[in-house]
């Protein structure tokens, strides 16, 4: 199992628009060309760091020495460690929660398996540590810590790495989204049709993949990276660019933390490969591939969940559902997620306009309204997948609940869109964007 040995060292950076070639340096897998003139607000970008650590990046190098492992340290974590060693007090010290907040958070965790779990409230109660707190609880409640003999301190350190490698300034692709997907995955792992077949390894893989599936997301989509000639797009040959990066980053953190170092090498290699297969399945461009295969299995009634391959396939489907389940939440939460993802689209559109690039589909705030985007997303992406998931679960209580929320939320967006058109005197179709437009915009499709 190879791993891209990288040093993540800064967020989205754009070259001067006067240059003939415009490119983007995304947080992750990036080599800076200079040490001076780095804007102070860029996360983890400090000129005193020795940028030679970023050199000699390879696509398939094995990690065999401590020196190589050190390259996997993210720039942000490297900076935090180095300034602490120099005796500099962090600018944002840890604020401890009072007992009232901790008590409320613990009470919420007692209901973590319910579909109306409010991840936004939970994130506030945990002072922005929803992902770490949730995963520590789930690893314990599923018996994974005992089964895999995981060290609690090492587990916590790894989870903090994952949480910190999400960009808090992203409206949508941030650690709260990862926590929301993880909570949904937990609910799906409890579905009776699936739960009785799952092994501890399946459960751990599902939770880890859900938590890390968008780690280090730059807040722009794959087409943006391709048209700006970003080096990650070249590295992964324009195929599942972000998903490959999320996977490689996850493996880097697993190895750096040594969370699984006590397990047999063959087992850790298998875990890394399966995590890759799960995370890569979230590529929206593969939606039809997975949907067609799921329909065929259900039609032929040939799913054998005692078979590891079939079980892994259903874990992929479960993760895909968890990743795009926002429209199936209650309206108050679903609406908030919709506004967040569209805000992220619009920010990308603003960047494209600023640098005289063609504005990507769904990213033009003047033309692409939130109701229109969401109606198309629900119609062409969410509904087909969740209908098949309901067939698989035998129309379980949770599946019926999700489809009910989906229908209600779609009606709400149609009503809002109709009101918008009445105000504008437009007779535009209420169907939303075409499916090919949605698939072109990875992430609209959150």
From Swiss-Prot:
Residues where a divalent metal cation 2 binds: 214
GO biological process, one term: signal transduction
PROSITE patterns per record: PDEASE_I_1, PDEASE_I_2
Active site: 173 (proton donor)
Domain PDEase: 97-420
Catalytic activity: 3',5'-cyclic AMP + H2O = AMP + H(+)
GO molecular function annotation: 3',5'-cyclic-AMP phosphodiesterase activity; metal ion binding
Cofactor: a divalent metal cation
Pfam families tied to this protein: PDEase_I (PF00233)
Pathway: Purine metabolism; 3',5'-cyclic AMP degradation; AMP from 3',5'-cyclic AMP: step 1/1
Cofactor note: Binds 2 divalent metal cations per subunit. Site 1 may preferentially bind zinc ions, while site 2 has a preference for magnesium and/or manganese ions.
Keyword Oxidoreductase: no
Residue numbers carrying Phosphoserine: 426
EC number of the protein: 3.1.4.53
InterPro entries membership: HD/PDEase_dom, PDEase, PDEase_catalytic_dom, PDEase_catalytic_dom_sf, PDEase_CS
Activity regulation comment: Inhibited by dipyridamole, IBMX and SCH 51866. Insensitive to zaprinast, rolipram, and milrinone.
Stated role: Hydrolyzes the second messenger cAMP, which is a key regulator of many important physiological processes. May be involved in the control of cAMP-mediated neural activity and cAMP metabolism in the brain.
Entry's family note: Belongs to the cyclic nucleotide phosphodiesterase family. PDE7 subfamily.
Domains: entry comment: Composed of a C-terminal catalytic domain containing two putative divalent metal sites and an N-terminal regulatory domain.
Protein's name in the database: 3',5'-cyclic-AMP phosphodiesterase 7B
Originating organism: Mus musculus
Gene: Pde7b
């Amino acid at each position: 199992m190879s791993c891209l040995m990288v040093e993540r060292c800064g967020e989205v950076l754009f070259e001067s628009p006067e240059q003939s070639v415009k490119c983007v340096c995304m947080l992750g897998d990036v080599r800076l060309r200079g040490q001076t003139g780095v804007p102070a607000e860029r996360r983890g970008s400090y000129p005193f760091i020795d940028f030679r650590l970023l050199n000699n990046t390879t696509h398939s190098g094995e990690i065999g020495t401590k020196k190589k492992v050190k390259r996997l340290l993210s720039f942000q974590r490297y900076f935090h460690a180095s300034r602490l060693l120099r005796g500099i007090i962090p600018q944002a010290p840890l604020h401890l929660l009072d007992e009232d907040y901790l008590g409320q958070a613990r009470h919420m965790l007692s209901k973590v398996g319910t579909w109306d779990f409010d991840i936004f409230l939970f994130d506030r109660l945990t002072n922005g540590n929803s992902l770490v707190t949730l995963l520590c609880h789930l690893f314990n409640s599923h018996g994974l810590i005992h089964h895999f003999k995981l060290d609690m301190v090492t587990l916590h350190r790894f989870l903090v790495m994952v949480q910190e490698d999400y960009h808090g300034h992203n409206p949508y692709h941030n650690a709260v989204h990862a926590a929301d997907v993880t909570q949904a995955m937990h609910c799906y792992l409890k579905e009776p049709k699936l739960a009785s077949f799952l092994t501890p390894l399946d459960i751990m893989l599902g939770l880890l993949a859900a938590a890390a599936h968008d780690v280090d997301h730059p807040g722009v989509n794959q087409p943006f990276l391709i048209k700006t000639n970003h080096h990650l797009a070249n590295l992964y040959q324009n195929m599942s660019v972000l998903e490959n990066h999320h996977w490689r980053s996850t493996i880097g953190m697993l190895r750096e933390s040594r969370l699984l170092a006590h397990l047999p090498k063959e087992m850790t290699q298998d875990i890394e490969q399966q995590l890759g297969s799960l995370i890569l399945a979230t590529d929206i461009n593969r939606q039809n591939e997975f949907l067609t295969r799921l329909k065929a299995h259900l039609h032929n009634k040939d799913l054998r969940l005692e078979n590891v391959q079939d079980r892994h396939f259903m874990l992929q489907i479960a993760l895909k559902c968890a990743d795009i389940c926002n429209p199936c939440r209650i309206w108050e939460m679903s609406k908030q997620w919709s506004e967040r993802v569209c805000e992220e689209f619009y920010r990308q559109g603003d960047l494209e306009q600023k640098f005289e690039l063609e504005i990507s589909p769904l990213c033009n705030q003047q033309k692409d309204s939130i109701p229109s985007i969401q109606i198309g997303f629900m119609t062409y992406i969410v509904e087909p997948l969740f209908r098949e998931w309901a067939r698989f679960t035998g129309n379980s209580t949770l599946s019926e609940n999700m489809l009910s929320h989906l229908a209600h939320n779609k009606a709400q967006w149609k009503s809002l869109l109709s009101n918008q058109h009445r105000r504008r005197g437009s007779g535009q179709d209420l169907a939303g964007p075409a499916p090919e437009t949605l698939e072109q915009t990875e992430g609209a499709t959150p």
